[in-house]
């Protein structure tokens, strides 16, 4: 069986993308790249003036960032960051499809419409999106205790972070 050289696993935060992606990549002998890591790299070579959404957490503990923003602000920052990241993600995907080693990209930055637009001219690309019920997303967020441990107000952090993920899941499926 021949597989496309570039695979994508997208979906909302905490749905299980990273776990699924690592298993698939290992089974196929592919590299595995998280869009979270791409975002960190982009942040390291940009400024708040050029990439404001990528720098939304600058100088703020991530737990305080989530607890202190509205759900709408969190979603706007996330979607804006993904837009800022997309040129770099697309360039990497095209390089791997054309001449580099097979790779699986995973992350919530893999917005369906952006990836679908590439399917028209990239025959070495295949994608899947994981979704979950609101209840499962809540269970997974609450189960990720290391993520919110140390927050000054854990329930407030979850009360903002979880609805952001649920709304992203809903928008992604629309």
What are these regions, as identified by a protein language model?
Residues 12-15:
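ATP-binding Walker
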Residues 26-77:
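Conserved substrate/cofactor phosphate-moiety recognition/catalytic segment
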Residues 66-122, 129:
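Glycine-rich phosphate-binding loop used to anchor ATP phosphates in small-molecule kinases
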Residues 122-169:
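A glycine- and Lys/Arg-enriched "phosphate-lid" helix/loop adjacent to the NTP-binding pocket
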């Amino acid at each position: 069986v021949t597989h496309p050289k570039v695979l994508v696993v997208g979906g909302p935060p905490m749905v299980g993308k990273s776990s699924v992606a690592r298993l698939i990549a290992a089974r196929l002998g592919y590299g595995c790249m998280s869009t979270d890591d791409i975002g960190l790299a982009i942040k390291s070579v940009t400024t708040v003036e050029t990439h404001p959404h990528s720098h939304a957490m600058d100088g703020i503990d991530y737990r305080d960032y989530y607890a202190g923003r509205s759900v709408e602000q969190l979603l706007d920052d996330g979607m804006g960051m993904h837009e800022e990241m997309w040129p770099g993600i697309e360039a990497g995907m095209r390089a791997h499809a054309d001449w580099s080693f097979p790779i699986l990209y995973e992350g919530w930055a893999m917005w369906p419409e952006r990836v679908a637009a590439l399917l028209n001219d990239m025959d070495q690309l295949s994608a899947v999106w994981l979704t979950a019920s609101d209840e499962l997303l809540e269970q997974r967020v609450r189960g990720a205790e290391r993520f919110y441990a140390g927050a000054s107000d854990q329930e407030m952090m979850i009360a903002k972070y979880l609805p952001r993920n649920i709304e992203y899941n809903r928008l992604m499926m629309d």
